[in-house]
Amino acid sequence: MAAATGGLTPEQIIAVDGAHLWHPYSSIGREAVSPVVAVAAHGAWLTLIRDGQPIEVLDAMSSWWTAIHGHGHPALDQALTTQLRVMNHVMFGGLTHEPAARLAKLLVDITPAGLDTVFFSDSGSVSVEVAAKMALQYWRGRGLPGKRRLMTWRGGYHGDTFLAMSICDPHGGMHSLWTDVLAAQVFAPQVPRDYDPAYSAAFEAQLAQHAGELAAVVVEPVVQGAGGMRFHDPRYLHDLRDICRRYEVLLIFDEIATGFGRTGALFAADHAGVSPDIMCVGKALTGGYLSLAATLCTADVAHTISAGAAGALMHGPTFMANPLACAVSVASVELLLGQDWRTRITELAAGLTAGLDTARALPAVTDVRVCGAIGVIECDRPVDLAVATPAALDRGVWLRPFRNLVYAMPPYICTPAEITQITSAMVEVARLVGSLP
């Protein structure tokens, strides 16, 4: 069967893929599950090729948490094509342009108070690198170059570049292979789901021991994403803000996965009503169209860095502030803000909660949890993709479980019936996990 894939048949695509392409977190030559060929994406649906035939499946992953408006939204398509006719790309060194200015102003307006300066980069991982670089340069500008370590709590994930890996969970995360060569950071115990003042007190005591060498505390607020899809009480963020201020340590929020409404607040920090010194956003920023991220910081951070010995923030991506990415990001954010997104997320949360409830009785299930438009089934053993993927496809859903987690972060446009279809597939996958030895 030929498809709209540049002349290659699905069989040819798989052959080229197997010979030449490396996929995320995969091996070459011994992949247990071959990739599925995607040929189209519209709304909340993907068109995949299975057994030589096209099938329509729901994108329950929002294509790794990016496509909050679904695929091919007319407003985003128009923004991209309009900008393409004017200017596809220019270097950002020495030049500026309207899409970057509009997006920067929009982000400053909607993010927590005080984040007045924006640095654009190519990806979430790079935005974390930039945030860490900001923190280190800030303290050098303050005449305290010894403040160069970072502190976080266990269970987090912040990206795949080297500094970002150093603040991912050192043992349970995806980067334990590199523990002996990564920068040695300070790790507090896993943050509990429910609020416990004793945890905050212990965190403060540990931070106090290292305050003289700490540049910043870095955390994912409310939801720890790829490190385990764990949720925690927003009051911990309020405590972190107070602790960091008292001990003169910067506070960095990684909102790459949580930003733009996913948790039920526009940004997860809003649940606690606190502002970090530095914040990273990405993923849903462009609505899933292009790769773009941003690192925002306070005027104090920006001016201190600029007044330091280097006289500049020493970072500059080639595709920084790409006009196409900025233009579609403006359209995506304005589309979100122009609708009753809070009600939409509340409805999605209700649908996920109701649909996943039956999973609680399954023998392999240890927890079921929902936060905004995030639904998670945690199992007592790893999920076998060779079993999970076809089972979900049988039910018209694209899922991508990892470790012992079956989860969904669906597009905000999903109907109640589509959410029911997604949760039914998740429950079936969890049931199969329990039926295997």
UniProtKB/Swiss-Prot annotation:
SUPFAM superfamilies assigned: PLP-dependent transferases
Role played: Catalyzes the reversible transfer of the alpha-amino group from S-adenosyl-L-methionine (SAM) to 7-keto-8-aminopelargonic acid (KAPA) to form 7,8-diaminopelargonic acid (DAPA). It is the only aminotransferase known to utilize SAM as an amino donor. Can also use sinefungin but not S-adenosylhomocysteine as substrate.
Keywords: Aminotransferase, Biotin biosynthesis, Cytoplasm, Pyridoxal phosphate, S-adenosyl-L-methionine, Transferase
GO MF entries: adenosylmethionine-8-amino-7-oxononanoate transaminase activity; pyridoxal phosphate binding
Source organism of this protein record: Mycobacterium tuberculosis (strain ATCC 25618 / H37Rv)
Top EC class for this record: transferase
Catalytic activity, reaction form: (8S)-8-amino-7-oxononanoate + S-adenosyl-L-methionine = S-adenosyl-4-methylsulfanyl-2-oxobutanoate + (7R,8S)-7,8-diammoniononanoate
Cellular compartment(s): Cytoplasm
Positions that bind pyridoxal 5'-phosphate: 124-125, 254, 317-318
Miscellaneous comment text of the record: Catalysis proceeds by a classical ping-pong bi-bi reaction mechanism.
Binding residues annotated for S-adenosyl-L-methionine, in chain numbering: 64, 157, 316, 400
Reported consequences of knocking out the gene: Cells lacking this gene are shown to be highly attenuated in a mouse tuberculosis model.
UniProt-annotated binding residues for substrate: 283
Record-annotated site: Participates in the substrate recognition with KAPA and in a stacking interaction with the adenine ring of SAM: 25
Any single Gene Ontology cellular-component annotation: cytoplasm
EC assignment: 2.6.1.62
Sites of N6-(pyridoxal phosphate)lysine modification: 283
PANTHER family (UniProt xref): ADENOSYLMETHIONINE-8-AMINO-7-OXONONANOATE AMINOTRANSFERASE (PTHR42684:SF17)
Protein name as annotated: Adenosylmethionine-8-amino-7-oxononanoate aminotransferase
GO biological process: biotin biosynthetic process
Pathway membership, UniProt: Cofactor biosynthesis; biotin biosynthesis; 7,8-diaminononanoate from 8-amino-7-oxononanoate (SAM route): step 1/1
UniProt family annotation: Belongs to the class-III pyridoxal-phosphate-dependent aminotransferase family. BioA subfamily.
InterPro entries: Aminotrans_3 (IPR005814), Aminotrans_3_PPA_site (IPR049704), BioA (IPR005815), PyrdxlP-dep_Trfase (IPR015424), PyrdxlP-dep_Trfase_major (IPR015421), PyrdxlP-dep_Trfase_small (IPR015422)
Predominant localisation class: cytoplasm
